[in-house]
Amino acid sequence: VASTPMVSLGVRKLGADLGIVITASHNPPSYNGFKLKSSFGGPSIPDDIAAVEKHIPEKAMKDLDSMDKIKEKGLLSYVNLEDMYYEHVMASFDIPAIRNSSFTIGYDAMYGAGYLIFPRILPQAKCLHCDYNPSFYGQAPEPIERNLKPFADMIKADPNMQIGIANDGDADRIGMFDGDGNFVDSHHILLLLLYYLHKYKGLTGKVVITFSVTDKMVQMAKKFGLEYEVTKIGFKYIAEIMTKEDVLVGGEESGGLAVKGHIPERDGVWIGLMILEFMAKAGKSLKE
């Protein structure tokens, strides 16, 4: 099982022209469809999508080669995208600091594509809904507060748990709870990311958000002397700017967030690890 960010990362690392993800994203499985990823490792821009659409036949094609014949022609090969992603994570984060920290981590995969990779990175995490179930047990795997009540209850029941992280069906979005089981929305996560990356890690760059995000992001960018831009709703607008400019943090209100040093793509696992690294370095809980 590969998450959407794994495919996006694979496209860029392998120098591919295009990536295709079959996913319902944060929707029920009946919404399964295509997500296209461009060569830069992010959501395809309108020009790339239009180029693909030109090749869609008016009638369904029936005379397609079998998978065996395609492999015989050398047109198909298999790549372990999970291993590629894991190695990229291990080279990018201080994972030992997170693993050796004193806080307990909760993780809700919502039966989605993060159910293998997150426990692999952090084996000590207490997992919920980390099973393979293509139907998501009938729930919509969107990491918003009303869909995460069992996860909130699990966190409240464990006095040692200081953070809960949830991902959607294809693991590109994030939801978060503090140790008291209070939901932490994307606005607050973005503020934490900006503070950590600039104040702790000394990084600079542009701040790009959609107009539905809290104005406190603009205020913080101004305070730090950083350039900022507010875009229309839709992560593709953020991704397009990330491919052309030096962007420190980008995000939208719906849980799609991206940061410097990674692909121009939403990545719920990556953002969760960034917050965990912040906690480990600061020695503080999420609530603090």
For the regions a language model picked out, list residue spans one by one.
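Phosphate-binding and adjacent anionic-ligand microenvironments
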Residues: 160-163, 203-288
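Gly/Ser/Thr-enriched, mixed-charge loops and adjacent short helices
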Residues: 32-159
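Conserved active-site and cofactor/substrate-binding residues in soluble primary-metabolism enzymes
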Residues: 2, 43, 47-51, 80-84, ...
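General beta-strand structural signal in soluble alpha/beta enzymes
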Residues: 1, 21-22, 107, 127-129, ...
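N-terminal small/polar loop signature for handling phosphorylated ligands or for N-terminal nucleophile
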Residues: 1-31, 120-121, 125-177
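Short, charged, surface-exposed secondary-structure boundary motifs
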Residues: 134-141, 195-197, 238-243
